[in-house]
């Protein structure tokens, strides 16, 4: 997706991405000064000390980096009513446009880093109001076709729709930037250069050789998952 950014936009994204790691170290030092234990256990290992705190802040900043990529590329459209740039992904596809609008990442309006950070902070503040301080959770990745976590449980999900959406291909737009900032925190999650695609449950003929093979792959996989 490198061609979807101007050289100036790539410089901005690369700079913000590099600063995420600097911010993590600064947060760690501040957390230690505030009295959090410096146990060296990261957030991926379930840590609760200074390092885990700093890495969690880094994850939130990476969310802002994703917003920056979405609103800082050469396919952002102009919104005539609000008079501001709009994001690339208005739907689950990359659009074609005649011209593009570009915000100022160092400004204070649409497309600015400070706007992304403040928006994410407000969203988390509202979310955390409903989460107990001592509440703990666990998230894992597993193949839906062979996992047993959902046995005897009701699971509500929005499944893939044949070849309607190229989830993994589109995810690479954000994945490469997240990996650049977070692979030291989540080495297993970001082990690959791009998102895994071989086992993705979508009926894409170009990946399976024909429409019939793609449909068969999708139906068999969906049957196992169900």
Residue ranges and their predicted role:
Residues 217, 221:
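Soluble or luminal CAZymes and related metallo-dependent hydrolases
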């Amino acid at each position: 997706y490198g061609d979807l950014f101007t050289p100036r936009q790539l410089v901005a994204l690369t700079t913000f991405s590099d600063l995420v790691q600097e911010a993590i170290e600064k947060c760690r030092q501040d957390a230690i000064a505030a009295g959090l234990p410096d146990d060296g256990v990261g957030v991926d290992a379930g840590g609760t000390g200074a390092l885990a705190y700093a890495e969690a802040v880094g994850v939130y900043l990476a969310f802002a980096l994703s917003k920056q990529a979405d609103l800082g590329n050469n396919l952002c459209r102009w919104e005539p009513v609000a008079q501001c740039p709009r994001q690339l992904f208005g739907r689950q596809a990359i659009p074609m446009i005649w011209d593009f609008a570009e915000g100022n990442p160092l400004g204070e309006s649409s497309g600015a880093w400070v706007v992304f950070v403040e928006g994410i902070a407000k969203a988390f503040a509202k979310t955390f109001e409903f989460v107990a301080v001592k509440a703990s959770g666990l998230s894992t990745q597993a193949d839906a076709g062979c996992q047993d976590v959902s046995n005897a449980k009701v699971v509500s999900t929005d499944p893939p729709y044949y070849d309607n959406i190229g989830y993994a291909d589109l995810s690479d737009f954000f994945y490469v930037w997240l990996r650049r900032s977070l692979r030291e925190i989540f080495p297993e999650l970001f082990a690959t250069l791009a998102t895994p695609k071989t086992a993705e449950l979508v009926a894409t003929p170009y990946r399976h050789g024909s429409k019939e093979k793609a449909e068969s792959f999708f139906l068999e996989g969906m049957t196992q998952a169900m």
